[in-house]
């Protein structure tokens, strides 16, 4: 009898722990136990897709993307480069702007003012004395703006790489988008570089990035 009383007392002391353990779920609930407000059983709105930016719906994303495409079409079809000739590469740049290659058919019109340009073509050797002027002209260009480095001297110093007076690449002064190799590069190479810049402009998503910030 003493043994039975001891076991009954032990079970009485462990009853709260058994009740607490019974409330712990060790398996996933079945579909039949889901509440009526669950998206899986109700006709409410589904959760947003993982590919959609936060805070924007699919129709809004589509409209914003189309506006971005329209802006990119206008920008790549009306590139106005500013002539920044520094050495012999500038002669090839002038050759590219003449009637033989006819850059006007691509909407490319050379402008003498940085405030009317969106692309700067750095053609030639950039010296330490000219570097502040290059940066000042770049800062005067409106956004969005791009830079094309034309020739070996503008890309990395070229023939004068070890000179004390030459900047070893104009990308140390301004950010460069397109590099055109050659010493000097031909007019076809410059045209190819501008076509690559048009592809880069076409991939921009300015409005979508601004909207999702």
UniProtKB/Swiss-Prot annotation:
Enumerate the Gene3D superfamilies for this protein. Answer: 3.40.50.12280
Q: Enumerate the subcellular locations listed in this protein's record, separating them with semicolons.
A: Mitochondrion
The cofactor note reads: Binds 1 [4Fe-4S] cluster.
What residues does the transit peptide encompass?
A: 1-31
Keyword presence, Oxidoreductase: yes
Which InterPro entries did the record assign? NADH_UbQ_OxRdtase-like_20kDa, NADH_UQ_OxRdtase_20Kd_su
- GO terms for cellular component: mitochondrion; respiratory chain complex I
Coiled coil regions, renumbered to chain:
none
| Gene Ontology MF term list | 4 iron, 4 sulfur cluster binding; metal ion binding; NADH dehydrogenase (ubiquinone) activity; quinone binding
Q: Catalytic activity, per the record?
A: a ubiquinone + NADH + 5 H(+)(in) = a ubiquinol + NAD(+) + 4 H(+)(out)
- Give the EC number(s) under which this enzyme is classified: 7.1.1.2
Give the EC class as a word. translocase
- Keyword terms of this UniProt record: 4Fe-4S, Electron transport, Iron, Iron-sulfur, Metal-binding, Mitochondrion, NAD, Oxidoreductase, Respiratory chain, Transit peptide, Translocase, Transport, Ubiquinone
Q: Which GO terms describe its biological process?
A: aerobic respiration; electron transport coupled proton transport; mitochondrial respiratory chain complex I assembly
Biased composition range(s): Low complexity: 30-42
**Subunit comment:** Complex I is composed of about 45 different subunits. This is a component of the iron-sulfur (IP) fragment of the enzyme.
Stored PANTHER family: NADH DEHYDROGENASE, NADH DEHYDROGENASE [UBIQUINONE] IRON-SULFUR PROTEIN 7, MITOCHONDRIAL
Q: Which family does it belong to?
A: Belongs to the complex I 20 kDa subunit family.
Instruction: Name the chain's protein.
Output: NADH dehydrogenase [ubiquinone] iron-sulfur protein 7, mitochondrial
Naturally occurring in which organism (per UniProt): Solanum tuberosum (Potato)
